[in-house]
């Protein structure tokens, strides 16, 4: 057998961090259908779902910071060392995912990146690390995945990158109608099947704020435009200098983006439903930046390049979502908490990882103190 044939038949080894979450769990179907090998996974405390994964993939090594189970190792680092994967799927939610992104880059492992917060809080640091790493980063967000796919063989001069957003469940509501939104309503996304945190981020537009910053770091441009597109069929577009466009379209199903990320955009397997053009109606509208402040905050960052701002936004947002779920604050209070945190901490100097970690910690403390005093819970 020729060497090339050996490589052809070799199973791709996949390590999934955050396997019991929405993205991580969805990846298991792709791993099975693509005939990859799940060599290991991590989870936090969803033991019931983890047990299901263990039964499906009995040879996979496991790490959990809170639960000991079959084939357990003691740390993220040990899990990576013992599995020696070809690619890591970072499907952790929030700031905690930064550690995994840095771990992949430092160990020269390819990365399917669903954890956008890594780039939001430390995009400049990740850019520095990538210069000395052989890792390739494949974005798993549907917008960035589709842009990556459209750009990879393109040689035309680009005028603008366009990403779309559904607007979440409240986009068409008047501002005063947002006053009494509850958590259960906010997690009901009209088009996508997503986890709780990202569903709230979609409802507040923080998700799109973060995706603008993510696109800036991934594609090295400030020329990023967002349009509300209620059908979630067109995920992204590229506008060229001759005013022609390329649009990337599919039914809203995250399996496609996960599949592209894990395969390095090489897979030919069909895992999602085809798009029907019968009675297809596509609508777009400009975002009201006064109503949806997070989009405005993202554009401000692109202009002022204050490294502290995205770290503050992310930490304050994560803490505010917890307070909202606990019914200690209202939906619109999320915006006030983030804005107050930005004003209080935006002059913090950020030059290295230690600064990122300290500002993340200090922002969370600020939110706790401010909210306790303001909302009297």
Curated annotation (Swiss-Prot):
InterPro entries tied to this protein: DXP_reductoisomerase (IPR003821), DXP_reductoisomerase_C (IPR013644), DXP_reductoisomerase_N (IPR013512), DXPR_C (IPR026877), DXPR_C_sf (IPR036169), NAD(P)-bd_dom_sf (IPR036291)
Residues annotated as binding 1-deoxy-D-xylulose 5-phosphate: 116, 142-143, 166, 189, 202, 207-208, 211
Keyword vocabulary terms for this entry: Isoprene biosynthesis, Manganese, Metal-binding, NADP, Oxidoreductase
E.C. number, please?
1.1.1.267
Biological process, per Gene Ontology: isopentenyl diphosphate biosynthetic process, methylerythritol 4-phosphate pathway involved in terpenoid biosynthetic process
- Which pathway is this protein assigned to? Isoprenoid biosynthesis; isopentenyl diphosphate biosynthesis via DXP pathway; isopentenyl diphosphate from 1-deoxy-D-xylulose 5-phosphate: step 1/6
Q: Which residues bind NADPH?
A: 20-21, 23, 46, 115, 117, 195
What are the binding positions for Mn(2+) in this chain? Answer: 141, 143, 211
Reactions catalysed, as given in the entry: 2-C-methyl-D-erythritol 4-phosphate + NADP(+) = 1-deoxy-D-xylulose 5-phosphate + NADPH + H(+)
Q: Which SUPFAM superfamilies match?
A: 1-deoxy-D-xylulose-5-phosphate reductoisomerase, C-terminal domain (SSF69055), Glyceraldehyde-3-phosphate dehydrogenase-like, C-terminal domain (SSF55347), NAD(P)-binding Rossmann-fold domains (SSF51735)
Function in brief: Catalyzes the NADPH-dependent rearrangement and reduction of 1-deoxy-D-xylulose-5-phosphate (DXP) to 2-C-methyl-D-erythritol 4-phosphate (MEP).
Q: Which family does it belong to?
A: Belongs to the DXR family.
Full protein name:
1-deoxy-D-xylulose 5-phosphate reductoisomerase
Q: What is the lineage of its organism?
A: Bacteria, Bacillati, Mycoplasmatota, Mycoplasmoidales, Mycoplasmoidaceae
Q: Which gene encodes it?
A: dxr
